[in-house]
Swiss-Prot record:
Gene source species: Mycobacterium phage L5
Protein name: Minor tail protein Gp26
Entries under InterPro entries matching the protein: ARM-like, ARM-type_fold
Superkingdom of source: Viruses
């Protein structure tokens, strides 16, 4: 609050908060408290003497005026609790963090934000938005102008057709209008008499005036005659006449040359007019809609008083504009009387500057024109190539933004409704308090004015005196500084020769520096040339290397092609081998069968004819053979010899089988390794299993089982805490188990096909091989039995059984499993035979 000395108030800020319930309650409480505390006791002494009472009243009024002049001191606690950010009602109003004191700062921030919004909106400056607006409006504007220009010929044709029809029917119009001739004559007579009566005095008054200005009119006529004579002199003389003739000649040539142009233009005009006439129907709908809407609008504005109000507003605006025109014209004339010389100087100076800038501006314009023209030429194909992408982008963005706006519309509507309702409620609650607030501010203003008004003149006088005293120092300061500056200028001038010498020294140094710079540039050029040479050599070497690589690739491709051709030939020959083997084995089988039959038949015939002689001879032969064999070989038991012979035969057959199956086993191991790598890489191993037999699958299963056991041992060696490692190994074990299942299925399938399928049994090669193998077996059995029978060995004894089993052992091998088991038995027998010896 102000005191007798006065307090300068820098700013009174008002901050309006939407929540006014607490504000109103606190304001009412504080006002009631102030009313209770502000109490004054006025002592009144009553006297019956009227004169004394009047004097006391005057004295009291003088005291009140004196106290009012001193000011009213009201103790108000405005201490602000900075920790709790609360300082009471007045503290909140006049200085609190959330009081009226922050309204100025908030208003300044709001103004800054509004200015920033004006400068930048959505990340784009005003210039950028102007550019966006131009780009957005350019295409529609060009389209509208082009459409109007395209429709203009048809509209002109329509109006021209209407005018031509009216001209052609003018006689009919005149004939139709002739019925109005009597009425028009009556009207003309009435109007003419009115003009005659009214204008007769006027023209009578003009008579003396015309008589007075007759000499002046004659002077004007003389001037016109002189002007016509001057023009005639120019056009009738030889140069003027030649120019007129040339103009007429060139005009004729121009009109002659316009013939094709007009023909083409007329054809284009007619074509465009025809197309526009076909589209007149499409123009009727919008025109009809416009006229209907315009009629409805006119009916509305003329019936509800809007038009009358608009005319009144227009009248007021027009009056203000015309009044402003008068005032501006008067002030402008006054300003022109004062600004004639300065404006003339400005125009002359600006003209001189512009004329001097014309060469530079011309160069800049040429530069900009060339650069922008070249830029446009180069950008045109780029824009053409990007046009589909721009169209797709515009369509996509349009769809996306339209959908987003449609989705955000209801939400923003609800938010706007909430904000509008809140602000409306807050302003409605604040509105009743504004008169009291304005009254309070008015009281503060009145007190400030009352308190400061007596002191303003004295303060102004004091400030004027201070300014005058300061201004009186100016001559002294100038008179002191000017001599110092005058003395300083020669000292500064003494430095100029030194600076000139320095510049001259630098200029003298330039001839020395320039050769050095040229040498450096030459060295740099040589270095660049060397680099270019090295680069060229490297490029050449790379080109040669590329050519070598291409030749190598070409040779490799030729080798692969030749290898492929050779492989095809080998495959073709291999495909022919089964047939050749089949035919050979078939013939061999037939020959063997026939020979066996002939041999057996001969034996049967011979034995049948000489049974007794054969028996005796066989006994002698057997005895002699046995003795000879025993003597030659040094053996006592032929059965033992034949037993070992059968064993050695089986062992040799096993070795042969092992040597024959060794490549197959190695191949199975290789395929198992490939299968393991395929499982590690996660590829499908089905292609590897194609074309494999049961034995190879069994070997693969054994390899996989060994790998599974190894991984299981490795998994058991990993600590249980390492779940990731154990899980990884378990995944590998699961993959191996799944692969074993696939191999087992493949083995079972092959086994089932071999046992139950008819395909293998129907193969001629298999039949031939089986017949070939069964023929010597049968022959050996029959011959052996007959021989044993001849030498007296028959029945189920040890020798006959051993020989029979040996023959069956040698020739009855049906599968690889049997061969492997035979190999194991032979190794065991060899060990036993060695121990027995």
């Amino acid at each position: 609050m102000p005191n007798s000395a006065g307090v300068e108030v820098a700013r009174i800020s008002v901050k309006v908060s939407p929540n006014t319930k607490e504000f109103r309650r606190e304001l009412k409480t504080e006002l009631e408290k102030i009313e209770r505390e502000l109490k004054g006791d006025v002592e009144i002494n009553g006297h019956l003497d009227a004169a004394q009472a009047k004097a006391d009243f005057k004295r009291m009024m003088m005291q009140l005026k004196t106290e009012a002049a001193k000011g009213v001191h009201v103790p108000v606690d405005v201490t602000v609790d900075k920790k709790s950010k609360k300082g009471g009602l007045l503290g909140g109003l006049l200085g609190g963090s959330r009081g009226l004191g922050d309204l100025g700062d908030d208003a300044e921030k709001a103004s800054s934000q509004v200015q920033h919004l004006g400068k930048s909106f959505l990340g784009l400056t005003r210039a950028a938005w102007i550019g966006v607006g131009i780009v957005a409006v350019a295409a529609p504007l060009v389209g509208i102008v082009a459409g109007l220009l395209a429709g203009l010929p048809s509209l002109l044709s329509a109006f021209g057709a209407g005018a031509g029809v009216v001209a052609l029917g003018m006689d009919g119009i005149k004939a139709a209008a002739s019925t109005l001739a009597p009425t028009l004559e009556t009207v003309k007579a009435a109007v003419s008499s009115t003009f005659q009566q009214g204008l007769t005095p006027v023209f009578q008054q003009l008579g003396p005036m015309l008589t007075a200005i007759t000499p002046n009119l004659q002077n004007v006529a003389s001037g016109l005659v002189n002007m016509a004579g001057s023009i005639t002199d120019v056009i009738t003389q030889a140069p003027g006449l030649q120019q007129i003739q040339n103009i007429l000649t060139k005009t004729g040539e121009f009109f002659t040359g316009l013939g094709p142009v007009l023909a083409t233009g007329t054809q284009a005009f007619l074509t465009l007019s025809n197309a526009g006439a076909n589209s007149f129907g499409t123009l009727l709908a919008p025109l009809q809609e416009f006229t209907n809407g315009f009629n409805d609008m006119v009916n509305r504005v003329t019936s509800n008083g809007v038009f009358e109000g608009a005319m009144q507003g227009l009248s007021q605006t027009l009056g203000s504009v015309l009044n402003l025109f008068n005032r501006l014209m008067e002030s402008g004339l006054q300003a022109m009387g004062q600004l004639g010389g300065p404006l003339s100087t400005f125009i002359n100076g600006f003209g001189d500057l512009f004329v001097s800038l014309m060469p530079a501006l011309t160069s800049v314009s040429g530069l900009i024109g060339n650069v922008l023209g070249t830029l446009g030429t180069q950008l045109a194909p780029i824009v053409t190539a990007l046009t589909p992408a721009f169209q797709t982008l515009a369509s996509t963005l349009g769809t996306m933004l339209t959908g987003a706006l449609q989705a955000l519309g209801p939400i923003l509507t609800q938010v706007a409704t909430l904000i509008g309702t809140t602000l409306n409620t807050a302003l409605q609650a604040l509105q009743p308090m504004l008169p009291s607030l304005m009254q309070s501010f008015q009281q503060i203003s009145d007190v400030l004015v009352t308190s400061l008004a007596p002191h303003i003149p004295a303060l102004a006088t004091a400030l004027g005196q201070v300014a005058g005293a300061v201004l009186q120092l100016a001559p002294t300061i100038i008179s002191t500084l000017v001599p110092a500056f005058v003395q300083l200028v020669p000292k500064v001038a003494e430095l100029v020769p030194t600076i000139v010498n320095l510049v001259q020294s630098f200029a003298n140094l330039m001839p020395v520096v320039l050769p050095l710079a040229q040498a450096l540039v030459s060295v740099a050029g040589a270095v660049i040339q060397v680099g270019v040479s090295i680069g060229g050599a490297l490029i050449g070497a790379l080109a040669n290397l590329t050519e070598i690589i291409s030749n190598v690739i070409k040779k490799v491709s030729e080798w692969v092609s030749s290898f492929s051709s050779g492989a095809q030939q080998i495959a073709a020959k291999a495909a022919e081998l089964p047939g050749m083997i089949q035919s050979a084995l078939a013939n061999l089988m037939a020959i063997g069968l026939q020979a066996g039959k002939d041999l057996v038949q001969g034996l049967i015939n011979g034995i049948g004819g000489m049974v007794s002689a054969a028996v005796n001879k066989a006994k002698e032969l057997a005895s002699s053979v046995a003795g000879a064999v025993k003597g030659f070989l040094g053996i006592e038991s032929p059965s033992k010899l034949f037993t070992e012979y059968g064993q050695f035969t089986a062992e040799g057959f096993g070795n042969g089988m092992e040597a024959g199956f060794k490549p197959v086993i190695e191949r199975a191991k290789d395929l198992a390794a490939e299968l393991s790598r395929a499982m590690e890489s996660g590829t499908d191993p089905s292609g590897i299993l194609a074309g494999l037999d049961q034995n190879e699958l069994k070997q693969m299963l054994a390899a996989l089982e060994e790998e599974r056991k190894r991984l299981k041992v490795e998994k058991n060696g990993i600590p249980k805490g390492d779940k990731a490692g154990r899980e990884a190994l378990q995944n590998q074990l699961d993959q191996i188990q799944a692969q074993k299942d696939i191999l087992s299925y493949q083995r079972d399938r092959i086994k089932n096909e071999s046992e139950y399928g008819d395909m293998a049994g129907e193969d001629p090669l298999v039949k031939a091989a089986s017949g070939l193998m069964s023929a010597p077996v049968d022959f050996a059995k029959a011959t052996g039995k007959q021989f044993l029978s001849d030498i007296g060995i028959s029945g189920d004894g040890f020798i006959s059984k051993a020989i029979t089993e040996g023959i069956q052992y040698i020739f009855q091998i049906g599968s690889v499993d049997e061969a492997l088991s035979i190999k194991d038995r032979e190794e065991s027998k060899n060990a036993l035979s060695v121990v027995g010896r």
